[in-house]
Amino acid sequence: MKRYLVVALTVCLAFTFNFSTATGAVKAGAACKKQGQVSISSSLKYTCVKSGKKLVWSKGVAIARPVVAITPSPSATPSPSATPATLTPSPTPTVNSLVECKLPVADGRGDVSIGGWPRISERSKVLGDVTATVIMVDFPDAPATMTPAEALARISPAQDVFKEMSYGKLSYNLKPQLKWYRMSKNSSDYVSGGWTFIKHRDYITEAAKLADSEVDFGNTDSLIILANPDAKGMGYSGPAFSAIRGSGITLDGRYVSNGATSAYDLNDWKSIWLNHEITHTMGLVDLYASTTSDRSNRYDGLRYTGEFSYMGLSSYQSNSPGLLAFERWNLGWIEDSQVECVKSSQFTKLITPVQISGGTKAVIVPISSTKAVVVESRRASGIDSAMSKSGALVYLVDSSIQSGLGPVKVFPSDLVNDPRYLKAPRALGESVTVEGVTIKVIQSDASGDTVEISK
């Protein structure tokens, strides 16, 4: 979407008029000498007129100052009058500045957020080449039996996923030290009582120091500690390392504030574990529910977004694990020119599938300073090849809500009949209303979904 800046410039022009110019102040009703005489004073034009038996100055008339509007096609027809014409203003646009759709960081955490333009300063690079140093560790109670190369193969597909999600804008490059380093304590000792930030950082620091004599961390952007996948004592939570306020680790003169450590659940999630955790280090939040609402519902953790986005509870085999358009926009993988921020009462737009590059990727309707309705198009392709229903996906983003508590909610929501949100995308003729905004699909084909938005 091209946007042009319209600048108004006041232009001072010198004109030659067939009248005299007064050197002193002129007042309406004051006596003048010659009928028809014209005088200019304080940007007002006065004419000497007959009033009864007297000649007096008429009421002053403002002299128009010409204004030139600079536009892409400045072709205006001058008025036949002495005053240069102004260009006719364009109709009020239906698409507004993106400012209102770029939701702020407003959840009070400080390390990750669904909002943020600009992004949180200590989060990882998201464009170009990112070097991820991989250190492999095992434990006295769980010595590795697989080779380092076999362990690396568990996470290496994540590189291609990042390339797909970013439309080739991010090259996340694993740089492994293919050697097992033995940690000083049993695996369960590190996670006993649960991870805290300090315990997690100490674990990473110990692993890095074990390898320091053989590894140059000078170019490290992201640090991965890959634990022996057979170490059950590491539990089922391999968290991201997202330091803030200078609390990261300095290695070989390089400050490192982003990374991740694996756990036993790597065997279940496989390399999408790395995509999920590293995307935290890029600043994004958990979309799955971190609290329990209904213990009888086995899909309770999916109650906000179902199986959309791998920032929820999505594996490679899930319905549609590709990142949402809003997430990709926040990371700079979708350009501003591919987003429409709409405040008009009615708007129609073709949205191209998020799975392919090019075209409009999202239509966003701001609701408040922290909340917006987003519409995107999804198709069964690439990482989303298992998607059961294509169409326009509608969701509400609220940057005042913290990670895991529902910062994104997909609609329509039917937790009884569709707890995985498999039927959520709107097909041709289907609609949904969110926050007073109605979205209806009026055309759908391989090129995407044309939606009509009204409120």
For the regions a protein language model found, what residue spans apply to each?
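A short, structural micro-pattern
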Residues: G128, R303-T305, S388
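A mature extracytoplasmic/lumenal domain signature
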Residues: G52, V61, D138, P229, ...
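Non-catalytic C-terminal accessory/binding modules of secreted extracellular proteins
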Residues: K102-D107, S113, T145-M146, A240-Y264, ...
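Zn2+-dependent metallopeptidase catalytic core
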Residues: P93-W269, W273-N275, S431, K440-Q443
